[in-house]
Amino acid sequence: MAEPRKSGLISHGIAAQNRKARFNYTIKDTVEAGIVLRGAEVKSLRMGRATLSEAFAGERDGEMYLFNMYIPEYQGGVLSRFDTKGPRKLLLKRKQIDQLLGAIARQGSTVVPLDVHFNPRGLAKVTLGIAEGRKQHDKRQAIAKRDWERDKARILKNR
């Protein structure tokens, strides 16, 4: 019996992750949103080539959009040209939009994407975090705590 072919494409699971967001911000709440993508964007995203490091969510005409999310052009398609950093509409219910807009209105809060993933049905979803910026000393404390946890686990393992 032949083995199934491994294509390297992501059918479900995390396609891109914003690792800096959890370090630079304190995440207060998370919301999962759908995202409007064209065919070539989905194919490029399934290859795991998106970047969320500079991305943020904002409001335009009463709707939520994701700005500065980089999805490179899909190499397999000739006619599929799209703006690699263009705004992408987020699919949210009105109550969720109002919650996010209220968070943006508060001073010091922003909405950042934490990851882009495909759900079991194969639909692209974005996990948004309502975040507040961390001060430099908070970042240092987080690093010290993480290092201590790592050292503690190493010590307990070697007992």
Swiss-Prot record:
SUPFAM superfamilies: Small protein B (SmpB)
Gene3D superfamilies the record matches: 2.40.280.10
UniProt KW Plastid keyword: no
Entry keyword annotation includes Translocase: no
Source taxon at top rank: Bacteria
CDD domains: SmpB
Family matches, as Pfam families: SmpB (PF01668)
GO biological process, alphabetically ordered: trans-translation
GO cellular component entries: cytosol
Intracellular or extracellular location(s): Cytoplasm
Keywords recorded for this protein, A-Z: Cytoplasm, RNA-binding
GO molecular function: RNA binding
Its biological purpose: Required for rescue of stalled ribosomes mediated by trans-translation. Binds to transfer-messenger RNA (tmRNA), required for stable association of tmRNA with ribosomes. tmRNA and SmpB together mimic tRNA shape, replacing the anticodon stem-loop with SmpB. tmRNA is encoded by the ssrA gene; the 2 termini fold to resemble tRNA(Ala) and it encodes a 'tag peptide', a short internal open reading frame. During trans-translation Ala-aminoacylated tmRNA acts like a tRNA, entering the A-site of stalled ribosomes, displacing the stalled mRNA.
Similarity comment: family membership: Belongs to the SmpB family.
Entry protein name: SsrA-binding protein
